[in-house]
């Protein structure tokens, strides 16, 4: 793992076009350009996307700008590491192989210069959050994923926009 190491979490890139979303993406891209100049390692610690569900032959075109920037970083030698969050758990080979260097579906840890690091997105860690932990088991189950993948991508993403908490609360901070 190369130094410096950067961490970014909960960006929640949206599929919708708005001035707020454009400003958020511009801010993210400035950060990614900075990381590119320093090389190193960049961890995306969950919820990079407000919703991401990859199909074997279909990727969401609304994230093209991010894919392009991330691919440029990877080609420039930046080690890109993606930890799946509760909004973007369902990645396949495009994100795992073409965009990122490493993908983690659970928490990860590493040691560096005698220090131990434990990296987690943090969803479902509250001891009393039984309902969410049950939901997490269901939506990450192979059966659920298989069933959801039967939906046409346009319909799947439309459903996701309806149930997204971030999409329904535009007053939440969107700064990167």
Predicted regions span which residues?
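Active-site-proximal loop/helix segment associated with metal-binding centers of metalloenzymes
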Residues: 122-176
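Short flexible/disordered coil segments
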Residues: 73, 100-116, 142-154, 175-176
């Amino acid at each position: 793992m190369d130094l410096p190491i950067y961490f970014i979490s909960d960006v929640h890139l949206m599929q919708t076009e708005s001035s707020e979303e454009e400003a958020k993406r511009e801010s993210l891209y400035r950060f990614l350009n900075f990381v590119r100049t320093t090389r190193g390692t960049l961890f995306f610690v969950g919820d990079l996307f407000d919703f991401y569900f990859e199909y074997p032959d279909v990727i969401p075109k609304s994230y093209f700008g991010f894919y392009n920037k991330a691919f440029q970083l990877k080609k420039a030698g930046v080690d890109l590491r993606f930890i799946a969050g509760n909004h973007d758990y369902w990645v396949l080979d495009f994100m795992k192989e073409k965009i990122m260097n490493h993908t983690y579906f659970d928490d990860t840890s590493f040691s560096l210069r005698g220090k131990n690091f434990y990296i987690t997105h943090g969803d479902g860690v509250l001891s009393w959050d039984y309902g969410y932990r049950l939901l997490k088991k269901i939506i990450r189950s192979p059966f659920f994923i298989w069933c959801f993948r039967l939906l046409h991508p346009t319909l799947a993403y439309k459903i996701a926009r309806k149930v997204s908490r971030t999409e329904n609360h535009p007053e939440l901070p969107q700064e990167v």
